[in-house]
Amino acid sequence: MIALIQRVKRADVRVGERVTGEIGAGLLALVCAERGDTEAAADKLLAKVLGYRVFSDAAGKMNLPVSNIDGAGRAGGLLLVSQFTLAADTNSGLRPSFTPAAPPDEGARLFDYFVAAARARHPIVETGEFGADMQVSLVNDGPVTFWLQVRP
């Protein structure tokens, strides 16, 4: 399972004109399930996303997780957006292959599981809409972007 996380000042996701998720300071996570991924892999990836220290402490070092973005216990937002293209095989030719991605029904199930688990562990969770054509807007903070991957 893959998450591309970006530290943001703010971010939102829309389907058409409808805002489906919006956060202030926090993390935008583009999330992808790969073939063979399990709920255990989703749990492991979520622990990594929630614990990854990408926010600056008082000394200016990236030392704080999304649950404590200011060092005083204030949680940041977590915007979760499904993006199967993260699993693309780009090793040959000029057209990506999406064979490594989980089939749509399994991808949806694992994304929904990931969202539910995130909501159980973090106070501010917003989402996109699985399988929809979405428009994602964000103001990167840094920029700070990390590729997190957990193998099943």
Curated annotation (Swiss-Prot):
Keywords: Cytoplasm, Hydrolase, RNA-binding, tRNA-binding. It is an enzyme of class 3 (hydrolase). A motif (Gly-cisPro motif, important for rejection of L-amino acids) lies at residues 142-143. It is found in: Cytoplasm. It comes from the Bacteria. One of its GO terms (cellular component) is cytoplasm. Its main location: cytoplasm. One of its GO terms (biological process) is D-amino acid catabolic process. It catalyses: glycyl-tRNA(Ala) + H2O = tRNA(Ala) + glycine + H(+); a D-aminoacyl-tRNA + H2O = a tRNA + a D-alpha-amino acid + H(+). Its EC number is 3.1.1.96. Gene3D superfamilies: D-tyrosyl-tRNA(Tyr) deacylase. One of its GO terms (molecular function) is tRNA binding. A Gly-cisPro motif from one monomer fits into the active site of the other monomer to allow specific chiral rejection of L-amino acids. Homodimer. Belongs to the DTD family. An aminoacyl-tRNA editing enzyme that deacylates mischarged D-aminoacyl-tRNAs. Also deacylates mischarged glycyl-tRNA(Ala), protecting cells against glycine mischarging by AlaRS. Acts via tRNA-based rather than protein-based catalysis; rejects L-amino acids rather than detecting D-amino acids in the active site. By recycling D-aminoacyl-tRNA to D-amino acids and free tRNA molecules, this enzyme counteracts the toxicity associated with the formation of D-aminoacyl-tRNA entities in vivo and helps enforce protein L-homochirality. This is D-aminoacyl-tRNA deacylase.
